């Protein structure tokens, strides 16, 4: 249907530590990570013959008109995220995720995922990735019930705030 771009399709590869950087940096074009670790970015850049292309951080947020509603939603659908990459990589099934996250409290989620209608707080949650040298940050809006409302009410103003943070 479409022609492939000249030079091929760039490939982004998720990494979590020194071993994955050493193994995948020579193979991939872009780094993807879920933790704002500057050592991943610098290690990727050093391990690639062409240097750093893009370093893409991925971070969950949970916008809702009410902060408690956002916390409840993030706890219900994303509480596993607080365990970090090493825990997530070792959980092969939904049952494993449930078991590993069964004792995660709502306040734990609120401390690790920016939740609520405060766009400044949501934007600030990206700052650690910028400080770590990431070139791009992908926001994951938790939950499906509020996606359209998020897009209609918050996405544009949030994007403006994020652009203002960019170096």
Language-model features and meaning:
Residues 1-167:
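Active-site-adjacent structural elements that line small-molecule/cofactor binding pockets in enzymes
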């Amino acid at each position: 249907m479409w022609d492939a771009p000249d030079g091929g399709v760039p490939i982004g590869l998720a990494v979590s530590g020194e071993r994955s950087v050493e193994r995948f940096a020579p193979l991939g074009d872009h780094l993807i990570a879920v933790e704002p670790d500057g050592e991943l970015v610098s290690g990727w850049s050093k391990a690639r013959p062409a240097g750093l292309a893009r370093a893409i951080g991925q971070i969950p947020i949970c916008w809702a008109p009410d902060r408690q509603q956002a916390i409840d939603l993030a706890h219900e659908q994303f509480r596993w995220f607080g365990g970090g990459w090493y825990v997530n990589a070792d959980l092969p099934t939904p049952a494993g995720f449930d078991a590993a996250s069964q004792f995660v409290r709502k306040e734990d989620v609120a401390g690790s995922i920016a939740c609520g209608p405060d766009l400044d707080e949501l934007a600030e949650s990206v700052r650690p990735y910028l400080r770590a040298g990431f070139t791009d940050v992908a926001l994951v809006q938790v939950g499906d019930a509020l996606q359209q409302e998020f897009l209609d009410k918050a996405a544009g103003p949030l994007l403006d705030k994020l652009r203002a943070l960019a170096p």
